[in-house]
Amino acid sequence: MFDRHTLSLYKRLLKYISGYKSAIFITLITIAIIAATEPLSAIILGNLVDESLIEKDPNSFLLLPLQLAAVFIVKGVAEYFSKVMSTWIAQKAIFNIRSELYDKMLCLPQAEHNQTSTGTLMSKVTYDVTQTGNALSEAWIVIARDSLTILALLATLIYYSWQLTLVMLIIGPIVAFFIDRAGKLMRTSSTDMQDNMGEMTHRLEEGLKGYQDIKIYGSEKYELDRFKASAESLRQNTMKVIKVSALNVPLVQVIAAIALSIVVYIAVQMVNAETMTAGNLITYVTAMGLIFEPIRRITNINATVQRGMAAAKSIFAILDTPSEANNGKIELSNVNGQIDFNNVSFSYLGTEKTALNNFSLSIPARKTTALVGQSGSGKTTLANLITRFYQVNHGTITIDGIALDEIELNNLRANIAFVSQNVVLFNDTIAANIAYGHEEYDEQAIMNAAKAAHAWEFIEKLPEGLNTIIGDNGTLLSGGQRQRLAIARAFLKNAPILIMDEATSALDNQSEKLIQEAMNSLRKNRTVIIIAHRLSTIENADKIVVLEEGSLKEQGTHAELMALNSIYSQLYKQGNLSEQV
């Protein structure tokens, strides 16, 4: 059950309950009491036979039944506290593991999120942590309690007849062999179960998020078949674990029953030969019968342990993944906003194509710079590098002459507001979404930000106003309304650097006009980087940068680039800018 690797994992898990020493101490006391009551009940039954039935001792008729009742009462109380305390400890551990895992996921580099599906990560937080918690709550209590019980009963058996006990101990190595073999089989299948659960959760997440596309393209059967394939793989691996577990327990019981039959036969002969009293026989047989139940439970818990250890291995793989590098010590203040790319090269993990190749660019402070180029030209990559979602392979990026990796990461991002075309809103109030990450803002500040983003015009018409719950990712709002809330969030943050990645693509003409008016005000005294589809969002930019396959091809104002009669001019004249930027 516990090979070296399993012990290593379990020891690491135990650190999550090491802070609850008082609760653990109480649990261990109750476990010891439970273990002691098992042989006591067997001894009392033996004494009842010898003293009450054979010797006819009048005092034993009342005393021994009372003792037996007291033992069971004490055992019942101890079992109650043992169950409650062990579950409390395990639930605390589950909370700690789940919180640490989620915190780790939030700190993982963007590249790790790109390689692992959201559904797989969700499965680790929900399913894997639960399996690990079961191993902590059930396994340690069963192993501790039943190991002590077995030792107590074994001591009783040896005391009453060490010769008979030797016969029973022969089954020990046989039982251990079957438990070890079953453990290895269940560990493999349990690991596959974790993967199947992650894949199934991923399929479910994709289906629920993209249900409109699934319906419009008539792909319901295709998606259902993919989901059923994942669910079937999970079912098959679950059945493998169940079959091994179901075979393991009765096999051990059959071996134990054979040993019991042999021992009972020999013991009866000893009673007939008057080398053992009838009471001692009852005590011995009762103790031997009692010892098989904790053996069965320990054998049965093997499946839970293996599932938990497979899940723990999966969890620790995430926890051991390096977090985002944050070695910077400099805290920015009074940011001017000059951004420089100096011979920067970058490629995404797992791809051979270079996204940026020896790229250099100066983005002037407190000016608006627009990035133009076809899909894959490197526009969004530049934005992701400025925010340090990714690290450059070569070269440096500086803000006001300070390299990004020398700036404390949280401080860097505190000075940047980011509005993406993929608006992320939360199932909370409008006010909470606008003030996201800045709970200290009062309602008036939130209202002013909403007005600046021209979001107030629809917010004030809602029955609950700023307190309106907007649904999962703002599903109760239109695309333009969701976009304006995201822009209001950027207004409220009031960072010296603003990045707008196609931020007005979801707006109608009227909404865009209102946003452009607000943006003209927001641009003052801050560095603005715009990646937009529509010409109206970049025509008035202080600087337009034309990118192509990760290289800078042209830069200048709209008038200057038109005069060059090159890439930008051709896009403009062909009327394709709105589709190719």
UniProtKB/Swiss-Prot annotation:
Residue span(s) of domain ABC transporter: 339-574
Classification of source organism: Bacteria, Pseudomonadati, Pseudomonadota, Gammaproteobacteria, Thiotrichales
Chain residues that bind ATP: G373, Q374, S375, G376, S377, G378, K379, T380
Annotated function: Involved in lipopolysaccharide (LPS) biosynthesis. Translocates lipid A-core from the inner to the outer leaflet of the inner membrane. Transmembrane domains (TMD) form a pore in the inner membrane and the ATP-binding domain (NBD) is responsible for energy generation.
Gene name of the encoded protein: msbA
Superkingdom, natural source: Bacteria
Subunit annotation: Homodimer.
Protein name in the entry: ATP-dependent lipid A-core flippase
Record-level GO cellular component terms: plasma membrane
Transmembrane residue ranges: 24-44, 61-81, 158-178, 251-271
PROSITE patterns documented for this protein: ABC_TM1F, ABC_TRANSPORTER_1, ABC_TRANSPORTER_2, MSBA
GO MF annotation terms: ABC-type oligopeptide transporter activity; ATP binding; ATP hydrolysis activity; ATPase-coupled lipid transmembrane transporter activity
All copies of domain ABC transmembrane type-1, residue ranges: 25-307
Entry text on domains: In MsbA the ATP-binding domain (NBD) and the transmembrane domain (TMD) are fused.
Pfam families xrefs: ABC_membrane, ABC_tran
Catalytic activities: ATP + H2O + lipid A-core oligosaccharideSide 1 = ADP + phosphate + lipid A-core oligosaccharideSide 2
SMART domains: AAA
Entry keyword Cell membrane: yes
